[in-house]
Every structure is written in C-alpha cells, then in structure tokens.
Amino acid sequence: LSGFYGVLNPFDGVVPYRLEMQAKLKVDDKKNLYEFWGDSLYNELRKESNVILNLASKEYSKCIEKYLSEDDVFITCVFGELNEDGKIKVKATEAKMARGLMVRYMASNNITEIDDIKKFVDLSFKYSAEYSTDKEFVFLKQI
C-alpha cells in the first residue's frame, strides 16, 4: 500500500517520494489521504480473495480495517519478543524489516495458502502457536 500510488504490485514502477498516509494533506475536497482513498484500497485488495494478510503498519492497515466485512478474513502478522512480564514487545525497525522479509519469503516460495506463512523463520523470528490467534499470527524473536 502506498499513500501516493495506492495498491502496488511487485513490478510496478514508482518514483521515489516521501509521503505518509497520516500526512495532513488536503486533496481535492478530502481532508486527508484516508478520506481521499476511501474504500478503493480495500476494494482493490478484496477483488481476488476475502483473505487479506496484513503486513502493513497500523498507519496503513487503518485504511483497510475500516471497511472489513464479516465475510473477510483479516490476519495481521506481529513480529516481537517477550518482555519480562511475558507481554509481546514490538520493536518498530525490526518489525518493518521482518514484514519485508515475509513478503520476500512468500514470493520466493510461491506461498498461496495462508497457513504456509507459519513456516517463515528469519531475523530469529519464528511462528508462535501459543501467542497466535486466528486473526493475529505472532512471530517471536528466538533469543
């Protein structure tokens, strides 16, 4: 997802730019990019399947979650580590790197079934069945 281009495909050409979805940018009569894109990003993702794997940041996934229906299966991947209290702590930079590596893993391995992403292991992150739910796949850093 891109605040500037919308939904991107793997080989789409893009010009380098710096624009965040949450930018307070008026476009036409819309007060921000969330309003500008409306449900069009969701509709584009939903064309092929009702299963949506969310590897986006909260900033970007917000523009999809708002439009989800009961028929949709929306699964978010969380990359973190357990702190002393047993709670999952997400380090933004590591999580961003892991999300990118997950995309590469899916493309390299031609992943078509959602459960196959559970086999992902990289940057010491490994799927945790104990902390995962049907809506959130948790990958914990192995220390």
Language-model region placement:
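Internal, well-folded beta-alpha domain core
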Residues: 2-133, 138-143
